[in-house]
Amino acid sequence: MKPTNYHLFDFLDFDPDLSRDESLWKAYKPTSVYEKDGDICINVPFQKQVLSNDMAPDTTSPREEYTLVIRQYTSGITRLFIGFGEESMTDQSEMLQFSDRVKKLPLQVTQTEGEWLITTQDGIQRALIHVKPPVLDRWSELLPDPQETLDLRLYPDGKREIRLAAYDHFSPPRYDALPLAFCKRNGVKERATLSFESKPDECFAGTGERFAKMDLSGQTFFLKNQDGQGVNNRRTYKNIPFYLSSRMYGTFYHTCAHSKLSLAGQSTRSVQFLSDQAMLDVFVIAGDTMEEILRGYRDLTGYPSMPPLWSFGIWMSRMTYFSADEVNEICDRMRAEHYPCDVIHLDTGWFKTDWLCEWKFNEERFPDPKGFIQGLKKKGYRVSLWQLPYVAENAEQIDEARKNDYIAPLTKKQDSEGSNFSALDYAGTIDFTYPKATEWYKRLLKNLLDMGVTCIKTDFGENIHMDALYKGMKPELLNNLYALLYQKAAYEITKDVTGDGIVWARSAWAGCQRYPLHWGGDSCSSWDGMAGSLKGGLHFGLSGFAFWSHDVPGFHTLPNFMNSIVDDDVYMRWTQFGVFSSHIRYHGTNKREPWHYPAIA
């Protein structure tokens, strides 16, 4: 669809021909405010709009009123919640893991004729609501008066003012942002939007592993995890619904719904968020330094655990080693030629059939898996194994998985969107919303960990079967959250068996920082691939993550994906880049061992 450059269509996702049964409801001036259990509850009426480029109230429809809740925490954190009669505020979420520093601070409200002042009990201002209409010097009736609005200012740390975008319009009917609104389709609430004011010189960072310039201002992102298929495009493996602002605040949108985030892109005056869920749960975090703000975010969603010491050594891999003899030959040569190496990774080739993940070694090429692993351990190597969270149609476990609903039953056939380099038909996605499926998956990994495997590569997880019946939630909500549930399961069983908490993961969402570590996906072995990886890693680190790596010297080659030769300079410079990342792993579609680059090794 061609852009219209109008907010209603390009950001709020209404069809330009307005052929669908959809409606937009804009927040108006609050009608009342009260205290409840230390929170401030604000009754906000919403007026249905006549849909067009020029918005106007649809006075034939009665207003609908819903409660906006303000909650204050220590660490300079203010929370806004509105469920539009569909959802209730909760701290019971996979994404949330409050630290001991997060304490609720009771709020109180003082009402005057023109404003409602919200403070903590120590008298520090935390929010202000203007309820008096703006002063006018009326001389013209050419245009209608502006509609009522929600004029709310937040002061999370008692100092910095973060305003909702109450008046982002050209003429009164021509809006470029709305402070608060929801949308209905076929009479059902299904989307919600919230906007903050943005300043002309404001800069932004974060939002996950964003392969973009360091200042994200002027850009709009669709927060939907998908196979990035490289690091030089708008797709990304790791969306995080959190951004940092140069005005020394950050915002965490507590949702796993597909969302849209515009950082002064749709309108240069507003940061806008649109969720494909009729709920908004927003934490605004302010501080004197970026470190304070990131700490506040981690106070809400969890801190990265420390990976084991051995993981900070050098990992060697390629796609892929195919036999115990090949691996032993490479490991022996690494030692003989004095190349440091601590972990050897086996990618897709350790199964009976390449890419056919059955969580079992090929009996011919790896006749004694446990002895093979223990032998490598004696040489100073730990073993990492590749796998993925899907069960193929011809996998050994398919009947068991289907019979017990360990994979979500499909409602119809769909093609894979990810980088499936095999001809396999992935028949289903392991349903981590179902505890029995999670335990089944853990048992599959435990068999490998009991042999001496020390790390599981939790590849993929960005895409799931969307036309499937998951036990715990709709696929539209599970899509982004899946990475967290998947990595949590692998991390927990690895720590239970080996004592070391670690995974090697590609996808991510809010909370995944608790289960390190992550790597940057399938970058090109080129200068622009290295630059894209670096940009992604920097934004990822500014999204609450501490441990991150990337394939040295890039994953694939060009023009031939598998077979082009990696430039010596790229290999050398990418190695240096890897040394100064938290973790370094050589990996890619062809040879990565240093003796294949004699001019520099």
Regions found by a protein language model. Name each.
Residues 2-24, 46-51, 59-72, 80-308, ...:
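Catalytic and substrate-binding clefts that recognize carbohydrates or anionic sugar/phosphate headgroups
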Residues 228-233, 317-367:
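A conserved hydrophobic secondary-structure block that centers on an alpha-helix together
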Residues 314:
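Conserved, well-structured core segments
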Residues 32, 105-110, 408-410:
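Short secondary-structure junctions
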Residues 3, 83-85, 145, 157, ...:
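Aromatic- and carboxylate-enriched substrate-binding clefts and catalytic-loop regions
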Residues 15-40:
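Non-catalytic, glycine-rich low-complexity segments
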Residues 30, 38-54:
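Extracellular/luminal recognition modules and glycoprotein regions
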